[in-house]
């Protein structure tokens, strides 16, 4: 089975959400459901997700925005996965 997560999204808006709202953004497989996305991210990065929002971008990519629990720091996770 291939990975549902294609890559972390690194934009100015994504960085603001990471800094101020404890959220991370990923480009994911267009057929992935919210539950599948949550399970994949939680198991891969060993974090707890509070909420997941998805949208299809104008370039036909699926963007997932996940809000992390207060116990997890989005900046630490981003550093671990190579965003910085």
Curated annotation (Swiss-Prot):
GO terms classed as biological process: translation
Gene Ontology CC terms, in alphabetical order: ribonucleoprotein complex; ribosome
InterPro entries: Nucleotide-bd_a/b_plait_sf, Ribosomal_uL23, Ribosomal_uL23-like, Ribosomal_uL23/eL15/eS24_sf, Ribosomal_uL23_CS
Domain of life: Archaea
Keywords of the record: Ribonucleoprotein, Ribosomal protein, RNA-binding, rRNA-binding
Cross-referenced NCBIfam families: PRK14548.1, uL23_arch
PANTHER family assigned: 60S RIBOSOMAL PROTEIN L23A (PTHR11620)
Family listed: Belongs to the universal ribosomal protein uL23 family.
Quaternary structure note: Part of the 50S ribosomal subunit. Contacts protein L29.
Name of this protein: Large ribosomal subunit protein uL23
Organism (species): Haloquadratum walsbyi (strain DSM 16790 / HBSQ001)
């Amino acid at each position: 089975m291939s990975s549902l997560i294609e890559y972390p999204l690194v934009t100015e808006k994504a960085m603001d959400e990471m800094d101020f709202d404890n959220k991370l953004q990923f480009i994911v497989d267009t057929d992935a459901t919210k539950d599948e996305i949550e399970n994949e991210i939680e198991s891969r990065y060993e974090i707890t997700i509070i909420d997941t929002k998805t949208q299809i971008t104008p370039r036909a990519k699926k963007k997932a925005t996940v809000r992390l629990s207060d116990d997890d720091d989005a900046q630490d996770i981003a550093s671990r996965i190579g965003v910085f």
